[in-house]
Amino acid sequence: MSSLLIEGGRPLSGRLNVEGNKNAALPLLAACLLTSEECVLENMPRIGDVAVMANLLREVGAEVDGVGTTTVRVRCRTITSSEPPAALVGKLRGSVLLLGPLLARTGRAILGMPGGDFPARRTIGTHVDALVALGARVLPSNGHALDTPDGMKAASFYLDEASVTGTETALLAAALIDGVTEIRHAATEPHVVEVCTFLQRMGVEVQGAGSSTLRVHGRKNLKGATHRLNGDYIEAGSWAVVAAVTGGEIEVRGARAEDVEGIAFVLKRMSVECTFEDGFLGIQKS
């Protein structure tokens, strides 16, 4: 589709439920590679990016069931390849999240240039620097190739930017390292907190979730886990804003109150009648 034709002038009204947060879905799928046991992810968004990530997991040895539904099951008994197909990697920016799990389980990761956003605008230097701090070595490559000739070791380091996927890459790599890894200048977004929660269910101790300093007590063997994704607060907020600017009334369910509070605060400051509580965001005519 090259263009969208939008006929405005009508209030947007109604009720809807948001699905799980896409920005949490991709790192959670990558985290499933950290264990040989089955992981179950519920309330998954039914979007193309999830299907692409599922195919990437299959290419490195995982069994993935339920794609296209809201419950996805992943089991990766053995990593069969440390180099997912470059063509598939090129379809998804989130493919960079495979670096940490592949290095942690196999000591090697080769990744073509991640797709999605224009590379000049978003690099993965922060991700690579974090992995190097944990013991990885950068190899000559047209994309990104790393190995760990002396193994991975716990470390304390400062991220040069509070990158979400950079923080998640560091978390996923540190999860399988014995000892305590300290990540400073970490991203604090709700989906980063959700990754911390999932890792804790797998047996990792994570301190400081939601703050800019994370302490990860890793372990060599992680267990499988079940996790229900939080609702996508960005989608919820988008619907709320559209309803507000068109003079409509809408009820959006599925997002947590603490995740939509900032959106509600701004709307109220603009004199929009807005109510929010856990699992509910409402916009009234104003």
Task: Describe the predicted segments one by one.
Residues 1-286:
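Short, structured segments at the rim of ligand-binding sites
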